[in-house]
Amino acid sequence: ALKTKGSALYLLGVRHDALGGSIVARFVGGDLEPLPAIDLTAVHREIALLREGYANGIVLGAHDISDGGLAVSICEMTFGARRRGLGVRIDSCERWAKDVGSAGAWFGEAGGFVVEIAATTAWEALARKHDVQPIRIGDVTDSGRVVLGESSFDAATLFDVWSAPLRGFYDATEEES
């Protein structure tokens, strides 16, 4: 869950213009596209960066990019903080994924992480040490909204939609809504 209004959000991991194997691809007919390539050496460096960042108090939180891509990962980060009124503002994908189409940027399931950072200068220095190029994509806000480029959604409404299929299976889900 998001921790602090005003903290920076960074992307680790390259976005690809491929939707192969993704949830979105199943709906738009692209499920037979190739899967995005995985650079295991880069992933190893990213995880080492996250571990040291957590140990030094620089990283406030992180979320993997997987099912549903970056857009879903960002939404999931807001769910635990929605009652505190926290939200996010993420820049247009044309800024942080210049050579990738918007579908691949937001919904491609190439690995990576969204990272909430307390101190950007220390984070960027630590990233250089680990030979990782994080990209600042946005900020944590007190708007209670998830703003993805030009699209804006109420975080509580997103949680209700996301958690609806779970109601009745998990008591905590009913209490949260």
Q: For each of these PLM feature ranges, what is it?
A:
Residues 1-38, 111, 119:
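Mobile "lid/hinge" segments at catalytic clefts and subdomain interfaces of large enzymes
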